[in-house]
Design a protein with these regions (language model features):
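Hydrophobic alpha-helical cores of multi-pass transmembrane domains in eukaryotic membrane proteins
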Residues: 11, 79-81
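Beta1/beta-strand and adjacent pyrophosphate-binding region of the FAD-binding site
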Residues: 72-79
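Reductase modules of NAD(P)H-dependent flavoproteins
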Residues: 4-6, 11, 16-64, 106-107, ...
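Short glycine/proline-enriched turns and hinge-like loops at secondary-structure junctions
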Residues: 67-70
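Hydrophobic/small residue at the entry helix of a nucleotide-binding pocket
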Residues: 81-85, 233
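A cross-kingdom signal targeting lumenal/periplasmic-facing segments of multi-pass membrane
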Residues: 84, 91-92
Length: 264
């Protein structure tokens, strides 16, 4: 939604069962076909390779219980494949603010996008028809299939002076930080995130003129929090919000919370 030139639906799947592994194998075969065709004939920039596949979409099953547009600040925390939910929420609110010009009265001024992963890894991408992309994770972590979308969204926000975004990536294994793609206004930390610290950073004014990450927009505008990923992560964030004092919550302007649990 934030990228006006995109009219596709991206589906994320983690290869852990028979069906998802078969889907992963399909995406790999299509990738090999694309690479082989490039070797014999260089495709045009606007040329895409489509494969007709019959799909059936079931739902809807509901959405986020809070509207991020009602809050001046938003914190999106995800772990592992929970990033699929957080990324969709990010794309939605950025599109409503930037592309649609706050048509619905959106108040959002700043967004912290925090993602906890095990490793950087890689990805396989396939295309099934003109409006569907498949991004298949073969193992945990794998920042590279999310990075292009994050870079696109960050670039869109860069042209909007009324919206600020900061991206924090927490890696819990010993990896090479230089392997991370360059995403605007992002930082990579080799540690597990503290949900309490992330929350406090969003509601605590900076000391003096120091600004690390998001700019301060003042108190009273409210904070919308979405946490998606393993149950331990979502539970920690729910506990962090619950431990806020009534006074702190009132000074912030209210705190809204939505959690989505992603398990194998």
């Amino acid at each position: 939604m934030s990228n006006v030139s995109s009219r596709t639906l991206t589906l994320g799947s983690r290869a852990v069962g028979d069906w998802s592994k078969a889907l992963h194998a399909y995406a790999q075969r299509e990738k090999d076909l694309i690479l082989s065709s490039v070797e014999t004939e260089k495709p045009r920039d606007d040329q895409s390779i489509g494969v007709p596949v019959q799909v059936m979409i079931d739902g809807p099953y509901g959405g986020c219980s809070i509207d991020l547009g009602e809050y001046e600040s938003a914190l999106l925390l995800s772990g592992g494949s929970g990033v699929t939910f957080a990324l969709g929420m990010l794309d939605d609110i950025v599109g409503r603010v930037v592309r649609l010009g706050r048509r619905g009265g959106e108040r959002t001024k700043r967004i912290e996008f925090a993602w906890c992963i095990r490793s950087f890894g890689g990805y396989h991408q396939g295309r099934v028809g003109p409006r569907f992309h498949l991004l298949i994770k073969a193992a945990a972590g794998h920042i590279h299939w999310v990075a292009p979308m994050l870079m696109d969204i960050a670039s869109v926000v860069a042209g909007c002076p009324s919206l600020d975004i900061h991206i924090s990536i927490f890696v819990t294994c010993l990896c090479d930080p230089e392997a991370v793609p360059q995403i605007p206004n992002s930082v990579v930390t080799m540690e597990r995130p503290s949900t309490h610290q992330l929350l406090n950073d969003m509601i605590t004014p900076p000391v003096g003129d120091a600004v690390d990450g998001l700019r301060w927009v003042g108190s009273g505008g409210g904070l919308g929090v979405c946490a998606s990923g393993p149950s331990e992560l979502t539970r920690e964030m729910a506990n962090a919000v619950a431990k806020l004092s009534l006074t702190s919550a009132e000074e912030v302007g209210g705190v809204g919370l939505h959690t989505e649990t992603f398990v194998l």
